Swiss-Prot record:
Cofactor entry: Zn(2+)
Protein name, UniProt field: Protein translocase subunit SecA 1
Positions contributing to Zn(2+) binding: C937, C939, C948, H949
Gene Ontology molecular-function annotations: ATP binding; metal ion binding; protein-exporting ATPase activity
Recorded catalytic activity of this chain's protein: ATP + H2O + cellular proteinSide 1 = ADP + phosphate + cellular proteinSide 2
GO biological process entries: intracellular protein transmembrane transport; protein import; protein targeting; protein transport by the Sec complex
Subunit structure: Monomer and homodimer. Part of the essential Sec protein translocation apparatus which comprises SecA, SecYEG and auxiliary proteins SecDF-YajC and YidC.
The family this protein is said to belong to: Belongs to the SecA family.
Recorded GO CC terms: cell envelope Sec protein transport complex; cytosol; plasma membrane
Domain of life, source organism: Bacteria
Binding site for ATP: Q87, G105, E106, G107, K108, T109, D525
Pfam families: P-loop_SecA, SEC-C, SecA_DEAD, SecA_PP_bind, SecA_SW
Species, as recorded: Nitrobacter hamburgensis (strain DSM 10229 / NCIMB 13809 / X14)
Region spans: Disordered: 911-942
């Protein structure tokens, strides 16, 4: 209460921050007449002037005011749109690296141009991130008019481009693309073997559109590049045949709140019997070590059958199981559940079971976007997640005032006992709205629910619009002109993804009824009366004559103006019956505009707010209302059975609803609980992923360093010496008598790994030989062996072979390391039962695994280079092609062999240049530069560097 009083007098922190921008807004407005007087050429020349000012030492903040004024004028000249003052504030928030919360219809796409232009002047590339290819292409094409006018280049990254096209797009001043494409390009770049093949530049500045969707809803979804493993499709199908034999409660228990499923004792016994009969059980018990993978697959099959619902979590299309995004209702083509879950779903649906995949590279959006030096975002709904965005991404949410006040009426929820009663009430409300020609958008939580509602409408005489038939929408327009309901409706879910933008854009036509899953269609405005752009695109496509096109567009404009007026007047006038003995009946008028009907509450308040926000854009009137039932997922999970019993006792009849602000508050509390739990899950997962992310950075940075160096000879030599050093230390420990040395073991290891037979036993038998002397002799012989290869094939060939083997071996071992980290992560939680912190245990063991990876890398690279045989070309080739390296077979253990072909005389590979030795100061290690492990230590001790400062 005191806080509310203080905010009333002093304003909130958000109000104060917004107020702080007013001086710069005033300055930008003051420049408007001067800049408006410039010619097009003079306006375009300002870009070069700004860049020169930056080169002379000015900062981006110093030139913000004139740069924003320039963009505003360019917007007026190219798009006919002038940035409002509140849009200038939004642009400043984006430039400062925070999140601008702007309501639907406030022009977020146009706002981005301000910060994009300013930051693109730095010449390091600006990435604009959208949620799908359509929006990336649309926004790039639309806003490029401003950028091109001002002399900047614009590229777009969409699915299907080759590397040459991608590299060209990233080289532009401004690049538009989807979060998936940016993330996958980063992963693919770090699997390349030449710097010139990499497509991305540095991660300088990104603006994320629909930032809540990408940084929160998809934060837990890793991007994974994978390769196929052995085909085990028959095994999945066998396991799936067991599922109908299991009974819920008796054989397994489901926790819907936690999304987990577990076998009971009876279920385990039943599964053991079924496995034994099918010949799939090894040993006596299901939980014997040999059956660990079997138990895993049983659990995944159980999850597939009990936690995943067709047409809600996934759909089946063209013999494939396609995941549905739970937040947007969109199909996630190309995405697959990991750890065998997707295969279990394929077996459940009796489609072709695809082979399991091995992870080759992965990253989460959380870690990808945190790589940018500056990150900002835009959305209509972020305040409910402000704590998470600040905690994880260090992004502050700033609520930008609307240009015009919001005139939408948000009504209290209506709660019914059963889903059938709820759907009947929704149908009745839709019919009432349709009768007065008010457009209705019905939001559903899944494809399944959207199709249930569609069936209700069909049974009551409504027809589904066929978007494949161009005449379908004409019927809707004709009915609107006549002022009569057409009784037509559209469905927007994953099945109709292709027409998404068109369906959404026309949801504001009088009498339109649109059923949409969650926030499908985000990014496309619903304009009252319809969309001029969409209608013009479809209705003038077949017209070749320009005069005919102009006439058609004029006709469409007149239509839309009339339709908009109809929608605004579609008010709902209701006479409320008085209570007995009270005042006479009163009349309530509810606004026209777009009517949003929610068919159930989502787990997240933000998703509900997004649905509401589709109505009431730019000061238009509108209304929203949620219809709920005690059988809805959120209500059921949070104990609606108790409420149902109470309502029955109170005498709530079938078809009656309860409506009260208290119910809204109770639901909001339930949603807050779910949001808090999901935040904790995401935060905890990030802590684990950060461990892998730190290691990923080291490996990826190392790869880039290796590719930047034309020669890795010194790196390879260091690895060789380190491996030999470790090998000798293992078998010939320091401060031990020669009689205690494991000479035979050392000799055998040298033969096995390096394929070299050295008289180690004879050297060890020499009187007074020390371990350092033994090490020195072995290293010298190994170096001589490698020098002979260089002499035989030439330094250019060996440099090429060394780099290729080093990079490919690093990739091979990194992939194996990822698998081990995944396995470790799955079981580490059990350490909690032993009173140990699973996260600390994971960090410790992951570090040990990483150390082992480095040791294995030294051994593998050294061994391969010692054994490598190079096949000479049969005839002269004009260019040096790629080398093929045959990797170690993990099953047979056969050695890797590298084969190179081509004219090696043309290779122009130079050795790594170390620091000038004459400039080394013995007392200042910082002046030594890179020192070889076998060089004398620059400190003057007389010892080798590896035994002195290089230890």
């Amino acid at each position: 209460m005191i806080g509310a009083l203080a905010r009333k007098f002093f304003g909130s922190a958000n109000d104060r921050r917004v107020k702080g921008y007013q001086a710069r807004v005033k300055a930008i407005n003051g420049l408007e007449p001067e800049i408006a007087a410039l010619s097009d050429e003079a306006l375009r020349a300002r870009t070069a002037e700004f860049r020169q000012q930056l080169a002379d030492g000015k900062t981006l903040d110093d030139i913000l005011v004139p740069a924003f004024a320039t963009v505003r004028e360019a917007g007026k000249r190219t798009l006919g749109q002038r940035h409002f003052d509140v849009q200038l504030i939004g642009g400043m928030v984006l430039h400062e690296g925070d999140i601008a919360e702007m309501k639907t219809g406030e022009g977020k796409t146009l706002v981005a141009t301000l910060a994009v232009y300013l930051n693109a002047l730095a010449g390091k590339g600006v990435h604009v991130v959208t949620v799908n290819d359509y929006l990336a292409s649309r926004d790039a094409g639309w806003m490029a008019q401003i950028y091109t006018f001002l002399g900047l280049t614009t590229g777009v990254i969409v699915h299907g481009l080759d590397d040459v096209e991608r590299k060209a797009a990233y080289a532009c001043d401004i690049t538009y693309g989807t979060n998936n494409e940016y993330g996958f390009d980063y992963l693919r770049d770090n699997m390349k073997y030449r710097l010139e093949d990499m497509v991305q530049r540095e991660h300088f500045y990104a603006i994320v559109d629909e930032v809540d969707s990408i940084l929160i809803d998809e934060a837990r979804t890793p991007l994974i590049i994978s390769g196929p493993l052995d085909d085990r499709s028959e095994f999945y199908n066998t396991i799936d045949t067991f599922m109908p034999n299991l009974e819920k409660v008796a054989d397994y228990e489901v926790d819907e709140k936690q999304r987990t499923v577990a076998l009971t004792e009876a279920g385990m016994e039943k599964i053991e019997t079924l496995l034994r009969d099918a010949g799939q059980l090894k040993g006596d018990s299901l939980y014997d070590v040999e059956n660990v993978s079997v138990v895993h697959h049983i659990n995944q099959a159980l999850r597939a059958h009990s936690l995943f619902t067709r047409d809600k979590d996934y759909i089946v299309r063209d013999d494939e199981v396609v995941i549905i995004d739970e937040f947007t209702g969109r199909m996630m083509q190309g995405r697959r559940y990991s750890e065998g879950l997707h295969q279990a779903l394929e077996a459940k649906e009796h489609v072709t079971v695809q082979p399991e995949n091995q992870t080759l590279a992965s990253i989460t959006f959380q870690n990808y976007f945190r790589m940018y030096k500056k990150l900002s975002g835009m959305t209509g709904t972020a305040l409910t997640e402000a704590d998470e965005l600040a905690d994880i991404y260090k992004l502050e949410v700033v609520e930008i005032p609307t240009n015009l006040p919001i005139a939408r009426l948000d009504e209290d929820d209506e709660v019914y006992r059963t889903q059938n009663e709820k759907y009947a009430a929704i149908l009745a409300e839709v019919e009432r709205a349709n009768a007065r020609m008010q457009p209705v958008l019905v939001g559903t939580a899944s494809i399944e629910k959207s199709e249930v509602l569609a069936d209700y409408l069909k049974k009551n005489g409504y027809k589904l619009i066929d978007f494949g038939d161009p005449k379908s929408m004409r019927k809707l327009y004709a009915a609107a002109r006549a002022g009569k309901p057409a009784k037509l409706f559209a469905v927007l879910n994953a099945r109709f993804h292709e027409q998404e933008a068109y369906i959404v854009a026309e949801a504001g036509v009088p009498g339109a009824i649109t059923i949409a899953t969650n926030m499908a269609g985000r990014g496309t405005d619903i304009k009252l009366g319809g969309s001029l752009e969409m209608r013009a695109q479809f209705e003038t496509a077949d017209l070749a004559d320009e005069a005919e096109k102009d006439a058609k567009i004029a006709e469409i404009k007149a239509d839309i103006e009339r339709f908009r007026d109809m929608v605004l007047k579609a008010e709902d006038v209701v006479e409320i019956e008085p209570a007995k003995g009270s005042k006479p009946a009163k009349t309530v008028t509810r606004p026209g505009g777009l009517y949003i009907i929610g068919s159930e509450r989502h787990e997240s308040r933000r998703i509900d707010n997004q649905l509401r926000g589709r109505s009431g854009r730019q000061g238009d009137p509108g209304r929203s209302k949620f219809f709920l039932s005690l059988e809805d997922d959120l209500m059921r999970i949070f104990g609606s059975d108790r409420l149902d019993t109470m309502l029955q006792r109170l005498g709530l009849k079938d078809g009656e609803a309860i409506t009260h602000p208290w119910i809204n508050k109770a639901l909001e509390k339930a949603q807050q609980k779910v949001e808090a739990r999901n935040f904790d899950i995401r935060k905890n997962l990030l802590k684990y992923d950060d461990v892998q992310n730190d290691q990923r950075k080291v490996i990826f940075d190392q790869r880039v360093d290796l590719m930047m160096n034309e020669s890795v000879a010194e790196t390879v030599a260091d690895m060789r010496h380190a491996f030999v050093d470790d090998l000798v230390t293992k078998h010939v420990p320091e401060n031990q008598y020669a009689e205690q040395w494991d000479v035979a073991g050392l000799k055998e290891e040298l033969r096995r790994v390096l394929d070299i037979d050295l008289p180690v036993d004879e050297w060890a038998a020499e009187e007074g030989i020390a371990d350092e002397e033994l090490l020195s002799r072995i290293e010298n012989r190994v170096d001589e062996h490698m020098a002979a290869k260089v002499g035989q094939w030439g330094p250019d060939v060996m440099r090429y072979v060394e780099k290729t083997i080093l990079l490919q071996t690093l990739d091979h071992l990194w992939r194996e390391h990822l698998v081990m980290l995944d396995h470790l992560r799955q079981v580490i939680g059990l350490r909690g039962y032993g009173q140990r912190d699973p996260l600390q245990e994971y960090k410790s063991e992951a570090f040990s695994l990483f150390e082992a990876l480095i040791a294995h890398l030294r051994e593998a690279v050294t061994g391969q280079l010692m054994r490598v045989e190079i096949v000479p070309p049969e005839e002269e080739q004009p260019v040096l092609p790629a080398m093929e390296v045959h990797k170690l077979d993990p099953h047979t253990g056969e050695d890797e062999m590298a084969f190179a072909q081509g004219n090696f005389a043309q290779a122009s590979l130079a050795p790594v240049v170390s620091a000038d030795r004459s400039s080394r100061d013995p007392g200042n290690p910082a002046s030594w530069g890179k020192v070889g492990r076998n060089e004398d230590c620059p400190c003057g001790s007389g010892k080798k560097y590896k035994h002195c400062h290089g230890r």
